[in-house]
Every structure is written in structure tokens, then in C-alpha cells.
Amino acid sequence: MKHKPQPVVKRAVLTALITLSLPVNALEKPQTMEDMWKIIQAQQKQIDEMKASIVKADSKVANSDLQTPEAKVAAGNVQNSEAKVANSDVKNLERKTNILSQEVEKLRTNLAIPEEKQLKSAYGLGPAASKVYQVDKGLSIGGYGEANYQNIVSDQGKSKDNADFERLVLYVGYKFTDKILFNSEIEFEHGTTGQGSEEEGEVSVEFAALDFFIDPMVNARAGMVLMPMGFINLIHEPTFYFGNNRPEVERRIIPTTWREMGVGLFGSITPNLTYTGYVVNGLDAQGFNSNGIRDGRQAGATAYAENFGYVVRTDYTPDALPGVSVGGSAYVGNSGQDLEYKGKTPNVFTQLYEGHVQWKYRGLEFRTLGSWGHINDAGILSDYKGQTVGSQNYGWYSEVGYDVLPFLFKDTPQYLAPFFRYEQYDTIASTPTGYEDNLNLDREIFQVGLQYKPIPQVVIKADYRNFSAKQGSVPDDFNLGIGFIF
């Protein structure tokens, strides 16, 4: 009995399967999440069919070994030549199957976590906080962290040296469509939360908002928003600013990190001129004290909303001055929240203004910022608090750094910048009638340091700060720390 050589059957099956697999490999990039899922299902089905056919073809080859000796001799010459071709086709099909399997896994991963793209700032936020604006669709995860050691100098034992994992932050965003996305920042401070000696740590939502993109000139945002004031309140990632500590002016006068519940608009009037404006719940004047308005922030925690605040910011980057940006912002609003302060119900109209300039040129980074604030009804608040609440406050600082590594190593991606910062601020620049000034809160700071980035996402910092006050003493400190973004 004459038997048909089995490698011919196997070769025909494999050739057909390879041919059928080509259209899947040539599929265009899916346009929607639904398209992507359909492709995954189709490819997975094809993988299963291809694997089953390989097993079936191998089985037929194995069965050919059971043929009679006469049939084997008759088909021997044909088998020898075509077996080589069949084996080659098997290997080729297995390779295509493996590639297809990898593509399916990649598509599945992209359903949850889109492909990583280069970090860059968007809409005034830091690079890591801007990741969701750079994905096509779906989930984005970023973050940053910073840890430091502080050595208190000449404090005569009143304060202790300390080591602190100051912040670990996660940015979680989700792009629903090209027109709607969600972005958020969740912060873990001081390494832990708990009771007793560990209660200094906390977990906070720094911002969480929905963006609605309408037109480059007009877009909307709603939720818990970062107040668009100064440099640091929007970009507080450790690779951005010099030193281990944020500038004191942007802590004492502009109370970074400052966020409130609100709604507003943002966009670009021209490619060089951007704006942001919000209506937010007002500050709570019960928290105002000698150190300023910082403790009046409500941070979206069951915030009083009897009074509203209004904030607007603009930034301009002139074509004639590459690397230069100039901007300013203003906040106004009542802070009394219809509450009684020893039988009185003041409005506590609160104002805060700031202007800033930044210049980046080759290895040079220069920033300067000035801020001024005014608090109405400061006398009523001072009587309520039992301490002087300044009716005016102000602060300013300038800083400069230069990356010196290009002078030593051409085309190096690393960064090493010595820097200098000078700050001056006074949280009681003007006192209400009948109350004394606290000259210890009228301070200036000289700071020098070194900033090293082995890669753009990682920074190592060392700095020394010299404090002085118009009255009394403030200890100096030496700081050493690390920071990272992702």
C-alpha cells in the first residue's frame, strides 16, 4: 500500500497558518481602548490555533514513523528533502507565535499603563506631575521623594539634629478621552502616620482635579486645585529647586503647598502668554497668627465656604529673550467665614500678590520672586489670638546656580551646580494699632550649596543656611539630602 509522505501535509498546514498570521501582524495601531481589546482577543485566538496546529503537525510526523518499511523506503527520498523544509517552517511558525504572544502582552499592559514617555512640564506643573498629559489614554503613575539630614548649628541644645524622609509622593492620573482627564497628587509626609511620638507624619491629597479641554485658549478645571502662585506651589519636585528646603519666602509669605477646593479656567492667550484663574473656598482667618496666613489654609478638608477667594496668574515667555519667563499672580477674598471673633464678625479681607522672573541660559539658572500681603481686621484677629497678627507681610528672594560639569566633561548628561540664594521676609511688616511687632520674625537668610544630578531624575544636595533676625537669634543649619522623580 502506497502512503503519502507526511511532511508534505505538515508543510501545507504550516504554510497556510503562516500566511494567515500575516494580516494580524500588519494591523494598524488601534485607535480606541475597545479596538485594542478586540485585537487582543483576535490575536490570542490565533495564537491558540497556531499552537494547536503545530501539535497536530508534529503528531502526523510522529505517526509516519509507524509506516511499513516498504512505504518508508518508497517515500524516503521525498521525506528527507521535505523534512528539512517542514522543520524550518515549524521553527518559523514558533518564532511568529512567540512574537505575537509578546505583542498581546504588550497590548494588555498598555490597557492599564501606557508606554513611558519623556518627562516634561505641562500647564505649569512639574515634569512628574505632568505625565498624564503625555499619554494617549488610560492610567499614568508618577511621583517624587526627598529625604534629608539637618545639622542644627549653634543652637545651644534647644533644637536637635534630625534625619527625615520628608516626602514620598504619588501622582495618579487617568486620561479618559482627549478632552477629559483626571490628575492627582497623594503625599506621605515624614515617613509615617500614627499616634504618640509618631503623629507628626500625615497622608494628604495635595491636589485632585478634572481637566476639560475645550480650546487652547479656554479650558476648565474643577476639584482640589493648587493655587497658581509663585514657583514652588506648582512645581515642588526636588529636582527643580536649589537646596534641601524650599525657599522660606514661599513657605512663610506664599504658604506652599497651598491648595483649596475650586473651579476655574486656564489656557494660552498666545503661544507665549498663559493664564490660570480660579474661584476657591476662602481662607479661614482663625488660623492666622504672627507667622502669617499659613495656618489659614483649609486644604479641602470640610472647608468653610461662606467666603470665596479669587486667584489669577499670568506668565509670559518673550521670543526676544530665550530662556526668560516673567509672571505674576494675585489672590483676594474675605477670610472671616461668617465666624465670631469675641463677639465680632469681621470680613477679614485678605490680599496676596507676587511677581517672579526666571532665566535659564546654557548652564545658568536664575530665579527671583517678590511677594506682599495685606490682612484687614488684623486688630480683631490679634485680640482673638492673643498675639500680634500682622496687617502686612512681605518677602523676596533671588537665587542663582551654574552647571560647571560641561567645562570639565564635554557632552556629559550629568549636572553639578554650585548655587547661592538670598532671602528676606517679615510676617509682621506692619502692626495693627496697639500691638507690638515681633522683630524676631523679620529675617534674612544667606544660603550656599551644591546640587548634583547623575541623571535628570535624581538629585543629591548639600547646603548651608545662615539665618539672622532683627532681634534675637535664629540657628544656622547644614543640610544633606537626596531627591528623585519618576
Model-derived segments and their meaning:
Residues 2-25:
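Gram-negative bacterial Sec-dependent N-terminal signal peptides
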Residues 22-23, 46, 103, 211, ...:
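A broad helix-preferring feature
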Residues 26-144:
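N-terminal periplasmic/intermembrane-space "pro-region" immediately following the signal or transit peptide
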Residues 32-40, 55, 137-142, 169, ...:
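A generic structural signal for ordered secondary structure
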Residues 84, 156-157, 208-213, 241, ...:
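Outer-membrane beta-barrel pore domains
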Residues 127-285, 306-322, 397-403, 408, ...:
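Outer membrane beta-barrel
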Residues 235-238, 247-254, 290, 303, ...:
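Extracellular/periplasm-exposed beta-strand and loop segments of Gram-negative cell-envelope proteins
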Residues 287, 292-339:
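Loop-centered beta-sheet repeat module
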